[in-house]
UniProtKB/Swiss-Prot annotation:
HAMAP family: UPF0266 (MF_01071). It is found in: Cell inner membrane. This is UPF0266 membrane protein YobD. Belongs to the UPF0266 family. It comes from Shigella boydii serotype 18 (strain CDC 3083-94 / BS512). It is a multi-pass membrane protein. Its main location: membrane.
């Protein structure tokens, strides 16, 4: 097993750990889930480039008669990338004392202001930064507003 294979195993393990945390652990942290809203995906061009580069590496490994384990590890990495970028749905998870956005816990007390932009993006001004929340269904913005008002 080469250093390349070890690095591939490390990346596959990291992506698998992230997927397990995102799907199973995060919804159970910090109390029961009050509301989970699916969000719009960001630009997919990065994911196309990532998976495309992995496919090029697989092709290069096969044509140069590289190690079979490397081909399988590259294929597993491409599948993990496909799952994370195209199958997994990003979401915002609201709890009793705060919410998870982009896998980061944010307490309601940190929200200084909330605005709704013309194109349906909820803007939350925090102490240090601004969150732009793009929901998949515009009707979910009303659910978010009602939940935040009722918990404050």
């Amino acid at each position: 097993m080469t250093i390349t294979d070890l690095v591939l195993i490390l990346f596959i393990a990291a992506l698998l750990a992230f997927a397990i945390y995102d799907q199973f652990i995060m919804p159970r942290r910090n109390g029961p889930t009050l509301l989970a809203i699916p969000l719009l995906r960001r630009g997919r061009i990065d994911s196309v480039i990532f998976v495309g580069l992995i496919v090029i590496l697989i092709y290069n490994n096969v044509t140069n008669h590289g190690a079979l384990i490397t081909t399988w590890l590259l294929s597993a990495l491409a599948l993990m990338g496909f799952y994370i970028f195209w199958i997994r749905v990003p979401k915002i998870i609201f709890k009793q004392k705060g919410f998870f956005f982009a896998n980061v816990w944010i307490e309601y007390s940190l929200i200084k202001a909330m605005n709704l932009s013309e194109d349906g993006v909820l803007v939350m001004q925090l102490e240090q930064r601004r969150l732009l929340i793009r929901v998949r269904n515009i009707d979910n913005l009303e659910k978010i507003y009602k939940l935040i008002v009722s918990t404050q």
